[in-house]
Swiss-Prot record:
Family: Belongs to the SBE2 family.
Domain of life: Eukaryota
Residue spans of biased composition, Basic and acidic residues class: 56-66, 127-138
Paired cysteines (S-S): none
Function: With SBE2, is involved in cell wall integrity and polarity processes like bud growth.
Record's protein name: Protein SBE22
Keyword entries, A-Z: Cell wall biogenesis/degradation, Cytoplasm, Golgi apparatus, Protein transport, Transport
InterPro entries the record matches: Sbe2/Sbe22_C, SBE2/SBE22_M, SBE2/SBE22_N
Compositionally biased region (Low complexity): 107-121
Main location: cytoplasm
Length: 813
């Protein structure tokens, strides 16, 4: 609340002031609350609030220079209390950083005419914005108007101030206007403020007009009164900043810069001024340094790091190629030693010799820690004062001896380091080796520090691992590698044991043949060994012949055509072109386009199939595969043996009864195959006679390699063997019988071995095809069962695993 005025009294009414544009402006401070947020940005340096305290600390320091009675009376009676802060409204900062950053250092405290013009224009807008509130707060506006009129009327002799050079705003004092209480109060307020400024700028000749904050109503008015005879224009900087109503105005910071006065800055203003000046100074330093470096870029000696030899002619220096090999002290010590050495060389006299001697001793003690430096090679140095030698000559001889010792030692050191790095280059990660091969980095120049920063488990272009993380990873990797090493050792042990076992089994085959392979005990041993090791190539033909027909060889002699007879028959019969095309298409489809195409097809294969086509049996399923593999195998010496063995295998192991048994038993609902396949719905589309039959069985053998094919035939032949030693064949008895009688009495029908083979493939290697029938249509030539040879190095181990699973399912029957 405003205290009652004792001297001036109250104004009965508030006059209106008409501007140049014809508007009536009243209630000068009626919109004080409405423009409170913006009015706080002005700096009321000469005003005081409620309790007589200045709004800034600098205002309080100069209260004593004004008229005490007049000032205190006006402040206590006329000024109202500051308005309450409305916390719900947004407040702008009094002075923003933009006011400093957007102003150059040379313009930071200057006010040009453009500032005055902008101030006036803003003041005009503000006055128009606030003119509508005159009637709402007459009391507040009358109080502020009283202050304004008092300061205006305090000017004597009818003086008039014109605000700005080009502004229409003027504050006039005349005899007629002096009678107005509002104008008297305003004149007194301006007078008091100007007395403050004169006291603050006592040493200045020209008085400084006040800087009035936005709490004053004068900046928001336009006065248009009659011109007087004696008018004095106020300088631009005096009221211009007062008229400017923006928070980021440079003029709002220091209003009196235009008059040359020095007003005390607030701490925030001094801080921002120092900040701006330091930034300008930093920019200047950077520009000067960049200019210096740009000028030095053209100097080749500075680019290469060369130093004039005249500066260090007597200083022992290391060669560039071996500098990195030396275990010297830290860079700080080396820099200190080198600088002291250069200083000592320039300083003459005894002090120079003493300093040089101490420097050389420190240098010697530094490099003596390196084991490669041999100081025993250095000759005895003269003693100063005893030997007739000058200090300069002493220093020169000492440096020469040190240099010779160093050069000789560095040569040995470089050789030893290079040899160590050559030996350790093989232990570097593959990334470094590949980079070295491409010319990016020399492995011989990789230091131990770099090796500590790299890791075998992280690419070289990524940041190095943390030491703890690196240790943890190395432990895990070491553990994994140790386990893998143990597994590999087990595999190697198993492989070695298998090799030994294979050699042992091959020797057993020989012993079984010598002891008579057709004995019952021998056949039991043979059936046990055959799952571990295939039959020897040199014994295969003999074992096949003995276990399938014994020494009587009745099947070959009586139930099949001899090779000579079939050759004679082929010479008399000429095959048609259609038959030849069928034979060649059969070879192409079942051999060349399948796994058998990896091996060279024998030239006799077409002949053997032609002979088989004109025989009594004709070409049977699997004949082309049997002829192909037996022709390229080393077990059979001639075509006669191949012809006899193919016919013998077909008549004993794949005869009609075996095929019929296979077709019926494999689809038996209570059989072994059904117990496995019917448990999985994925087999329901192939558990039928169209997919599972004796003809589709041969589609599997089209996809196996030669070694596994021969091993499979070895097992099938062995499982169809009979102990002819215990029940020999009587030739006279079977000399007149047909093949069916002989087969029923002397041929073993073993379909279980064929069904178990198909079951093994269906359960464990059923990938790449839908069923056994579609297996023949797979176009991939490299598709192989159990696995392609290109995908695995140890194919023998894979074959052994395949046979082991086959044995497991065979035991189920």
């Amino acid at each position: 609340m405003i205290r009652p005025r004792s001297n001036l009294g109250t104004l009965p009414e508030e006059p209106s002031v008409e501007s140049k544009s014809g508007r009536t402006l009243a209630g000068i401070t009626s919109s004080r609350k409405e423009s409170g947020m913006r009015s706080r940005t002005s700096s009321g340096s000469a005003q005081a609030v409620g309790l007589g305290l200045g709004r800034r600390p600098s205002d309080n320091l100069f209260h004593g220079h004004a008229d005490p009675l007049d000032t205190m009376q006006m402040l206590s009676e006329a000024l109202p209390q500051p308005p309450k802060i409305e916390h719900g409204m947004r407040r702008e900062r009094p002075i923003s950083n933009d006011s400093i950053m957007t102003t150059k250092s040379s313009e930071i405290f200057s006010t040009s005419s453009s500032d005055t013009q902008s101030n006036i224009s803003v003041a005009t807008n503000d006055s128009e914005d606030h003119s509508f509130g005159m009637d709402k707060s007459v009391d507040n506006s009358s109080t502020n108007a009283t202050l304004t009129n008092r300061s205006i009327e305090n000017r004597s002799n009818g003086d008039s101030y014109s605000i700005g050079e080009k502004s229409d705003v003027s504050v006039n004092r005349s005899t007629k206007s002096g009678n107005n209480p509002l104008q008297r109060t305003q004149s007194e307020t301006i007078s008091v403020n100007m007395s403050h400024n004169r006291s603050m700028n006592g040493a200045m000749k020209q008085p400084t007009p006040p800087f009035m904050g936005k709490n004053s109503s004068i900046p928001n008015l336009r006065y248009n009164s009659q011109p007087q005879q004696d008018n004095r224009s106020v300088p631009n900087g005096e009221f211009g900043s007062k008229l400017y109503n923006l928070s980021n105005s440079t003029s709002a910071i220091i209003p009196n810069a235009g008059t040359g006065s020095k007003l005390a800055l607030t701490p925030s203003q001094r801080y921002r001024l120092r900040k701006e000046q330091s930034e300008h100074a930093l920019r200047d330093v950077i520009k000067r340094k960049e200019k210096l470096y740009d000028e030095q870029d053209g100097i080749i000696e500075l680019q290469e790091g060369d130093i004039d030899g005249s500066f260090i002619f007597n200083v022992p220096m290391s060669s560039y190629s071996t500098t990195s090999f030396l275990n010297t002290t830290r860079q700080k010590d080396s820099a200190t030693n080198s600088s002291s050495t250069i200083t000592e060389r320039i300083t003459p006299g005894e002090n120079q010799s003493q300093n040089n001697r101490e420097s050389n001793m420190s240098f010697a003690s530094t490099i003596s820690s390196t084991s490669m430096l041999d100081f025993f090679e250095m000759p005895t140095s003269p003693i100063p004062g005893v030997n007739k030698v000058s200090d300069f000559q002493y220093l020169q001889d000492t440096t020469k001896h040190l240099s010779s010792v160093y050069l000789h030692s560095s040569t040995k050191l470089s050789k030893s380091k290079l040899s160590e790095r050559t030996a350790s280059a093989d232990c570097l990660p593959l990334e470094f080796k590949e980079a070295s091969e491409k010319g990016m980095e020399d492995l011989l120049l990789v230091s131990e520090n770099k090796l500590d920063a790299v890791s075998h488990t992280r690419p070289s272009w990524l940041p190095p691992k943390d030491p703890e993380e690196k240790k943890l990873h190395e432990r895990e990797i070491s553990k994994t590698l140790s386990m893998a090493s143990l597994d590999q050792l087990e595999k190697n042990k198993d492989r070695d044991s298998k090799i030994i076992k294979d050699e042992t089994n091959k020797q057993k085959y020989v012993l079984l043949v010598d002891r008579n392979i057709t004995r019952k005990s021998s056949l039991q041993s043979l059936k046990k060994i055959i799952w571990e090791t295939p039959i020897n190539a040199e014994l295969r033909n003999h074992i096949y012949d003995m276990v399938l027909q014994s020494e009587a060889r009745l099947v070959t002699e009586r139930f099949t055509e001899s090779f000579d007879d079939i050759i004679k028959l082929s010479n008399r019969i000429e095959l048609t072109k259609t038959k030849e095309i069928e034979i060649r298409n059969l070879i192409t489809a079942n051999i060349e386009n399948k796994a058998g195409g990896k091996y060279d097809v024998s030239d006799d294969l077409v002949l053997m199939l032609k002979l088989k086509s004109i025989s009594q049996q004709g070409i049977l399923p699997g004949d082309e595969l049997l002829f192909h593999h037996l022709l390229i195998d080393d077990s059979f010496e001639n075509l006669n043996q191949v012809w006899e063995m193919v016919n013998l295998i077909q008549m004993t192991c794949f005869n009609e009864i075996t095929k019929d048994k296979f077709d019926s038993k494999i689809l038996e609902k209570s059989g072994v195959v059904a117990s496995y396949m019917l448990q999985d719905d994925s087999f329901k589309h192939e558990f039928n006679a169209n997919c599972l039959n004796s003809n589709t069985w041969w589609n599997i053998l089209e996809r196996v390699n030669h070694d596994l094919f021969m091993w499979i035939i070895d097992i099938i032949v062995t499982m169809n063997s009979q102990p002819f030693k215990n029940s020999p064949i009587n030739k006279e008895k079977y000399s007149e019988v047909n093949w069916d009688v002989y087969r029923d009495n002397k041929v073993l029908i073993n379909y279980q071995i064929l069904i178990s083979f198909a079951l093994n493939v269906l359960l464990n290697y059923h990938f790449g095809f839908n069923d056994l029938k579609s297996l023949a249509d797979v176009k991939d030539k490299n598709f192989c069962i159990p696995i392609s040879e290109e995908n695995y190095l140890d194919i023998d181990e894979i074959n052994s695993l395949f046979v082991g699973k086959w044995k497991h399912y065979f035991k189920k029957f």
